[in-house]
């Protein structure tokens, strides 16, 4: 069921490409801005809905009827804010609690540093969503101004791709610990963990920076709506947005996912060759890898399809499918805490001890149970911490 849910934006995108395609000539009254009836030049397929700047008002964009219908439909105004709301309701407390426990209860290990940064990235992603939820629920009306729009866009993408990069760092740490345990004693130090965290944050910041350099708020023609990032002028696509989002998809998603595939592939092979006593760790590693691929590949594949053909009508309104697929990608921040932290009996015991101020003597039984489970699967919690 989850697989179908995550793949439906791709199906929607291909159905849009065969049906309501973006026309190369706007047939709406005044949409070409003035008396020039010539066909607009073919530009690269746009990141957002293709907007034509009105000749007498540079703050207003005219959209084709097909794009306008998708922009104002139930998917962006109801489904997308519902998905973002789920991330906020589940991801905020789950990641906040996990970060608190990791910072106050967990041992100061290099792997703990990586998991703390992952929890922080997922937490910041959830905190970046309320303005976008308000925007979509208000029927695509952005009330916060241009600067806030740029910051909200950069925060959404920066923290999401920062999470992907940190997931890759965690996979490398797990690879060293399980595939090269002897070498890991020398390599898996605080210096390596700190370097991986700094590299992930700096890369995420560099990828998000171009999202703050171009104007992103425009008024929708024949309405009172001010759009944030959802409709952008065609002439800005090839020069700015195409390279910016191509780099985001390739460097922020597919390259880290490739690293995760290689690291977790080797980890799975090592666990499988070790015997049945690693069965739980084997299944958990497979779930971690599958969730990352399932949540991030559809939206980033749609993003690259935008720029795979020079004609704006080649793929139709793929952006209409990209918006919900992006919202689905943010759901990964809700899943991370449960497959990286709360799956561990030892971590759950630390949560209970922290919440209810239980002394170590009160948790002997639960710790003994966790240790017994660890012996049965080759250190249950060590796979995560």
Curated annotation (Swiss-Prot):
<feature type="topological domain" description="Cytoplasmic">
    <location>
        <begin position="269"/>
        <end position="283"/>
    </location>
</feature>
<keyword id="KW-0732">Signal</keyword>
<feature type="transmembrane region" description="Helical; Name=1">
    <location>
        <begin position="83"/>
        <end position="103"/>
    </location>
</feature>
<keyword id="KW-0812">Transmembrane</keyword>
<feature type="transmembrane region" description="Helical; Name=4">
    <location>
        <begin position="193"/>
        <end position="213"/>
    </location>
</feature>
<dbReference type="GO" id="GO:0004930">
    <property type="term" value="F:G protein-coupled receptor activity"/>
</dbReference>
<protein>
    <recommendedName>
        <fullName>Proteinase-activated receptor 4</fullName>
    </recommendedName>
</protein>
<comment type="similarity">
    <text>Belongs to the G-protein coupled receptor 1 family.</text>
</comment>
<dbReference type="GO" id="GO:0005576">
    <property type="term" value="C:extracellular region"/>
</dbReference>
<feature type="signal peptide">
    <location>
        <begin position="1"/>
        <end position="17"/>
    </location>
</feature>
<feature type="topological domain" description="Extracellular">
    <location>
        <begin position="48"/>
        <end position="82"/>
    </location>
</feature>
<feature type="transmembrane region" description="Helical; Name=6">
    <location>
        <begin position="284"/>
        <end position="304"/>
    </location>
</feature>
<feature type="transmembrane region" description="Helical; Name=3">
    <location>
        <begin position="152"/>
        <end position="172"/>
    </location>
</feature>
<feature type="site" description="Cleavage; by thrombin or trypsin">
    <location>
        <begin position="47"/>
        <end position="48"/>
    </location>
</feature>
<keyword id="KW-0094">Blood coagulation</keyword>
<keyword id="KW-0807">Transducer</keyword>
<dbReference type="Pfam" id="PF00001">
    <property type="entry name" value="7tm_1"/>
</dbReference>
<feature type="propeptide" description="Removed for receptor activation">
    <location>
        <begin position="18"/>
        <end position="47"/>
    </location>
</feature>
<feature type="region of interest" description="Disordered">
    <location>
        <begin position="21"/>
        <end position="42"/>
    </location>
</feature>
<keyword id="KW-0675">Receptor</keyword>
<comment type="function">
    <text>Receptor for activated thrombin or trypsin coupled to G proteins that stimulate phosphoinositide hydrolysis. May play a role in platelets activation.</text>
</comment>
<feature type="disulfide bond">
    <location>
        <begin position="149"/>
        <end position="228"/>
    </location>
</feature>
<dbReference type="GO" id="GO:0015057">
    <property type="term" value="F:thrombin-activated receptor activity"/>
</dbReference>
<keyword id="KW-1015">Disulfide bond</keyword>
<feature type="glycosylation site" description="N-linked (GlcNAc...) asparagine">
    <location>
        <position position="56"/>
    </location>
</feature>
<dbReference type="InterPro" id="IPR003912">
    <property type="entry name" value="Protea_act_rcpt"/>
</dbReference>
<dbReference type="GO" id="GO:0051281">
    <property type="term" value="P:positive regulation of release of sequestered calcium ion into cytosol"/>
</dbReference>
<dbReference type="InterPro" id="IPR017452">
    <property type="entry name" value="GPCR_Rhodpsn_7TM"/>
</dbReference>
<dbReference type="InterPro" id="IPR000276">
    <property type="entry name" value="GPCR_Rhodpsn"/>
</dbReference>
<feature type="topological domain" description="Cytoplasmic">
    <location>
        <begin position="344"/>
        <end position="385"/>
    </location>
</feature>
<dbReference type="GO" id="GO:0007200">
    <property type="term" value="P:phospholipase C-activating G protein-coupled receptor signaling pathway"/>
</dbReference>
<keyword id="KW-1003">Cell membrane</keyword>
<feature type="region of interest" description="Disordered">
    <location>
        <begin position="362"/>
        <end position="385"/>
    </location>
</feature>
<dbReference type="GO" id="GO:0007596">
    <property type="term" value="P:blood coagulation"/>
</dbReference>
<dbReference type="GO" id="GO:0007186">
    <property type="term" value="P:G protein-coupled receptor signaling pathway"/>
</dbReference>
<keyword id="KW-0356">Hemostasis</keyword>
<feature type="topological domain" description="Extracellular">
    <location>
        <begin position="130"/>
        <end position="151"/>
    </location>
</feature>
<feature type="topological domain" description="Extracellular">
    <location>
        <begin position="214"/>
        <end position="247"/>
    </location>
</feature>
<keyword id="KW-0472">Membrane</keyword>
<dbReference type="GO" id="GO:0030168">
    <property type="term" value="P:platelet activation"/>
</dbReference>
<feature type="transmembrane region" description="Helical; Name=2">
    <location>
        <begin position="109"/>
        <end position="129"/>
    </location>
</feature>
<feature type="topological domain" description="Cytoplasmic">
    <location>
        <begin position="173"/>
        <end position="192"/>
    </location>
</feature>
